[in-house]
Amino acid sequence: MKKTNDNYHSARFVMSAPNIHHLPPDQGMEVAFAGRSNAGKSSALNTLTQQKNLAKISKTPGRTQLINLFEVAEGIRLVDLPGYGYAAVPLAIKIKWQKALNEYLNKRDCLRGLVILMDIRHPLKNLDQQMIVWAINKRIPVYLLLTKVDKLSRSASKIQLDMVKEAILPFMGDIEVDVFSSLKKIGIDKLQNKLNAWFSGSVNE
């Protein structure tokens, strides 16, 4: 397989789907991006692909209501999952999102890894930890990105990073954590390397 780090900038939007029943066939490889509303998922995807408008960014938390697919190369996709944890979303919609999220995570066999984005100032909220536990139980590798690191000083960022590293030890799974900033392009190379490693496996036919 061609190195995908040469292809991220060529990523293209494929579709938005309300649930897995509207997604393409469960083939190839996908890496999903998850996180609380306003954790910076869309910004991270745009930075990764060097396309500022690939994933729509909104200042309104909870705007990502659908499963959004982006194709990097044939059979290789990035998935932007609905943001979770925004209290102002009506309960009926919240339940609908939760069902779509659960179905994708539990039934999508081509999922190769899960990137969970968390604001470095507010990491490891209950829903974040639930996502980690789910992934570990399913033996899905997890990459935690502490976003918006540019909002903190270097020393404060290190304190937060060390705290999260310590906190995830009890999870005992394939889980790593790094800092990230879409604004300052911090952590982009490490993210690319992680995705390349996940995508280097054999394609699920």
Swiss-Prot record:
Residues 27-201 form the EngB-type G domain. One of its GO terms (cellular component) is cytosol. InterPro entries: G_ENGB_dom (IPR030393), GTP-bd (IPR006073), GTP-bd_ribosome_bio_YsxC (IPR019987), P-loop_NTPase (IPR027417). GO terms for biological process: division septum assembly. The keyword Metal-binding applies. Pfam families: MMR_HSR1. Gene3D superfamilies: P-loop containing nucleotide triphosphate hydrolases (3.40.50.300). It comes from the Bacteria. GTP binds at residues 35-42, 62-66, 80-83, 147-150, 180-182. Mg(2+) binds at residues 42, 64. Its cofactor is Mg(2+). Keywords: Cell cycle, Cell division, GTP-binding, Magnesium, Metal-binding, Nucleotide-binding, Septation. Belongs to the TRAFAC class TrmE-Era-EngA-EngB-Septin-like GTPase superfamily. EngB GTPase family. This is Probable GTP-binding protein EngB. It comes from Hamiltonella defensa subsp. Acyrthosiphon pisum (strain 5AT).
